[in-house]
């Protein structure tokens, strides 16, 4: 069907798991954090500053999946959304209470690391690795 395009995933020869996190997982986490903050009615300008992206990037995150140019390579499973919301809450509080930028950045780093660790433990990052890279065994236990 013309309207139903299946996105072809170009597989690479090999990626280290950290590259998968940088190229695929972090952009998707930024997108989901931005959307959580939008639902909390934070201004786009503030969200962009918090996440270290441009305002047009936030606008892209709001588009439907197939229309996005940013953070569109992978989907974060729905059962992780409560954790995304929790991280967005902590980051928003740290931003508004911010005695210094360092305190906010430490909170953001801690929350993003917590989310990545949870995704890794649940095998989500392994699934993304298999989807985007040749030769990742189904029972790979390297991470």
Locate predicted features.
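Helix-turn-helix DNA-binding helix
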Residues: 58-59
């Amino acid at each position: 069907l013309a309207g139903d395009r299946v996105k072809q995933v170009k597989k690479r020869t090999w990626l280290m798991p950290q590259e998968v996190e940088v190229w695929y997982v972090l952009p998707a986490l930024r997108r989901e954090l931005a959307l959580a903050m939008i639902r909390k009615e934070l201004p786009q300008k503030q969200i962009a500053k918090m996440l270290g992206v441009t305002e047009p990037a936030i606008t892209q995150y709001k588009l439907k999946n197939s229309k996005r140019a940013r953070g569109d390579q992978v989907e974060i499973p729905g059962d992780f959304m409560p954790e995304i919301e929790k991280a967005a809450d902590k980051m928003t509080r740290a931003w508004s209470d911010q005695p210094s930028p360092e305190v906010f950045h430490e909170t953001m780093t801690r929350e993003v690391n917590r989310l990545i660790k949870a995704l890794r433990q649940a095998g989500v990052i392994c699934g993304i690795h298999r989807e985007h890279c040749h030769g990742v065994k189904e029972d790979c236990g390297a991470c």
